[in-house]
């Protein structure tokens, strides 16, 4: 969520594909129940440009916005999140199974990242606190 940098939906998979993108967006929409016309900004990955994903967005009143090809600065907030995820989580641990990885990823995203880790962009507030303040 761009407002407070909060992770709204996060899924792990060995394949980045349209089904993963749709399922993740479905979870986000169920959790937040946003107004029609909410903007989903992404890169131009195949999973986001697929007709199936475009139809899913249209059906759910999600307006797609995409960064220019080869320009990660257009999607800087997500790029920063993935950098944080790698350096504060993924590179620090060894996971014995995908189930353990999924569990620990859930704890990091929805626990530490959203409720414990402050962000400069939020004036030192956690993503959760920033969302509560904005509401």
Located regions from the model:
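Short, acidic, Ser/Thr-enriched surface-loop or helix-capping motifs
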Residues: 1-2
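Active-site beta-loop-alpha junctions of metal-dependent nucleic acid enzymes
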Residues: 10-34
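Residue-level signal for well-ordered, solvent-exposed loop/turn and beta-edge residues enriched
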Residues: 5-6
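Acidic/histidine-rich, metal-coordinating catalytic segments
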Residues: 34-49, 68, 123-127
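RNase H-like polynucleotidyl transferase catalytic core
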Residues: 40-44, 58-77, 94-97
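C-terminal domain-tail junction helix/linker
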Residues: 58-62, 84-135
């Amino acid at each position: 969520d761009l407002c407070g940098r909060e992770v709204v939906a996060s899924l792990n998979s060995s394949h980045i594909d349209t089904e993963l993108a749709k399922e993740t967006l479905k979870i986000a929409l169920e959790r937040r129940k946003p107004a029609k016309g909410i903007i989903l900004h992404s890169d131009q990955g195949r999973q986001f440009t697929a007709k199936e994903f475009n139809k899913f967005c249209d059906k759910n009143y999600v307006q797609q916005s995409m960064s220019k090809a080869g320009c990660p600065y257009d999607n800087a907030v997500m790029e920063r999140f993935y950098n944080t995820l790698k350096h504060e989580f993924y590179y620090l641990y060894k996971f014995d199974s995908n189930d353990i990885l999924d569990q620990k990823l859930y704890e990091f995203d929805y626990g530490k990242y959203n409720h414990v880790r402050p962000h400069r962009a939020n004036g030192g507030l956690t993503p959760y606190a920033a969302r509560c303040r904005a509401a």
